[in-house]
């Protein structure tokens, strides 16, 4: 018995720490730091550890299933012709959990309550999956109310009422700072894979994650999840690097809004967009977006037309001249973006983006050749690949 316990302890210690450290805007984030790593023994203990105010390194060494733990709701959801009925579509649609139904009709529905209320992550936390075993099912994570210094690494978040819009968000950032989201997988979510609230998300690095949009219920009626990333915060700096976004159909990502004092800088580097049955980037006002070394394969609309007229500033690096022109402000030659079997890429070289980026050059991560993106990203992004 003692030998078995010791073996388990040693196995956990192999994965007991965060792997690597964040680059980009979340550089310096330490999470639970030197706190003793530990795996919770019950759902109640998991919730307590994630939400309390103590520095912790929390090991997720199994599937923690929240489905059914807070009951279910049976009632009426809104069925919309374009997103729910899906006449002629290739998948089922999504009904809407909401209290109005203009232009639609009410239908009976039943959804799980746990997914509607995320776990509020306290400051100074590292939530780390063990090998490929770390799964949080039926509930998301939220960093808000001034909490900061959080690492979420090597976790699969899945099954948050995927058949319903507003069924749940996987990761929420609202009045937060210094968050590193790394080597996770997100799948089968009702609404957003990652969403910011109206407050600031702060300094965030989203790296090496797999956003898996394959689903039986799609608002795009095509078996691809629509609600991918919605970034709206008041004062946000995003490094988005090495992520694999596949089989999604929209908001991949959407950023910016004129409804708040939103100010967003977004550096997207070496991401792989694959089989996107709608649009990838959708950029609104009050944003500065630098895109380099991203690979778009079978993407209907890599960058929406509205992105060019909504007021945001973009540097899309689509020509040799644009790549070389980075050097004057940034001190390096940008990597161009590549398309394969995809819609047209829009050429924008707003100088304001380079000027903005030059103020924090130390937070701009390096790139590798865009031709290497598909193989490298698929090999590295997601759980169990640390």
Curated annotation (Swiss-Prot):
A GO-annotated cellular component: extracellular region
Domain of life: Eukaryota
Signal sequence region: 1-16
Glycosylation sites: 124
Family: Belongs to the polysaccharide lyase 1 family.
Classification of source organism: Eukaryota, Fungi, Dikarya, Ascomycota, Pezizomycotina
PANTHER family the record matches: PECTATE LYASE 18-RELATED, PECTIN LYASE F-RELATED
Keywords: Carbohydrate metabolism, Cell wall biogenesis/degradation, Disulfide bond, Glycoprotein, Lyase, Polysaccharide degradation, Secreted, Signal
Enzyme class of the recorded protein, top EC level: lyase
UniProt function note: Pectinolytic enzymes consist of four classes of enzymes: pectin lyase, polygalacturonase, pectin methylesterase and rhamnogalacturonase. Among pectinolytic enzymes, pectin lyase is the most important in depolymerization of pectin, since it cleaves internal glycosidic bonds of highly methylated pectins.
InterPro entries cross-referenced by the UniProt entry: Pec_lyase (IPR002022), Pectin_lyas_fold (IPR012334), Pectin_lyase_fold/virulence (IPR011050), PEL (IPR045032)
Gene from which this protein is expressed: pelE
Subcellular location: Secreted
UniProt-annotated catalytic positions: 251
One Pfam family named in its UniProt record: Pectate_lyase_4
GO molecular function annotation: pectate lyase activity; pectin lyase activity
Organism: Aspergillus fumigatus (strain CBS 144.89 / FGSC A1163 / CEA10)
Main subcellular location: secreted
Protein name per the record: Probable pectin lyase E
Catalysed transformations (reactions): Eliminative cleavage of (1->4)-alpha-D-galacturonan methyl ester to give oligosaccharides with 4-deoxy-6-O-methyl-alpha-D-galact-4-enuronosyl groups at their non-reducing ends
GO biological process: cell wall organization; pectin catabolic process
Disulfide bonds: 77-101, 326-334
EC number: 4.2.2.10
């Amino acid at each position: 018995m003692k030998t078995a316990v010791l073996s388990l302890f040693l196995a956990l210690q192999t994965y007991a720490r965060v792997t690597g450290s964040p680059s980009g805007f979340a550089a310096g984030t330490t999470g639970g730091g030197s706190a003793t790593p530990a795996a919770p023994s019950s759902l109640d203990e998991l919730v307590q550890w994630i939400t309390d105010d103590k520095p912790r390194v929390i090991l997720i060494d199994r599937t923690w299933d929240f489905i059914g733990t807070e009951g279910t709701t049976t009632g009426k959801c809104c069925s919309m012709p374009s997103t729910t009925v899906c006449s002629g579509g290739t998948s089922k649609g999504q009904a809407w959990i909401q209290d109005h139904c203009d232009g639609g009709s009410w239908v009976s529905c039943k959804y799980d309550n746990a997914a509607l209320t995320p776990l509020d992550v306290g400051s100074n936390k590292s939530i780390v999956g063990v090998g490929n075993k770390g799964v949080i099912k039926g509930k998301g994570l939220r960093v808000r109310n001034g909490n900061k210094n959080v690492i979420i690494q090597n976790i699969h978040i899945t099954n948050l009422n995927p058949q319903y819009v507003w069924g749940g968000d996987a990761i929420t950032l609202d009045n937060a700072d210094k968050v590193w989201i790394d080597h996770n997988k997100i799948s089968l979510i009702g609404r957003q894979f990652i969403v910011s609230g109206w407050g600031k998300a702060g300094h965030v690095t989203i790296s090496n994650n797999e956003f898996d949009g394959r689903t039986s219920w799609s608002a795009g009626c095509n078996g691809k999840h629509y609600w991918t990333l919605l970034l709206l915060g008041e004062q946000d700096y995003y490094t988005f690097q090495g992520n694999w976004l596949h089989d999604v159909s929209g908001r991949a990502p959407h950023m910016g809004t004129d409804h708040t004092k939103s100010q967003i800088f977004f550096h997207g580097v070496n991401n792989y967009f694959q089989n996107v049955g709608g649009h990838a980037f959708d950029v609104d006002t009050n944003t500065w977006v630098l895109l380099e070394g991203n690979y778009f394969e079978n993407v209907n609309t890599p960058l929406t037309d509205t992105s060019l007229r909504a007021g945001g500033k973009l540097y899309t690096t689509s020509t040799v001249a644009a790549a070389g022109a980075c050097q004057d402000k940034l001190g390096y030659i940008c990597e161009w973006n590549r398309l394969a079997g995809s819609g047209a890429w829009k050429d924008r070289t707003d100088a304001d983006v380079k000027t903005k980026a030059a103020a924090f050059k130390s937070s701009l991560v390096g790139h590798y050749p865009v031709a290497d993106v598909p193989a490298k990203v698929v090999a590295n992004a997601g759980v169990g690949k640390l």
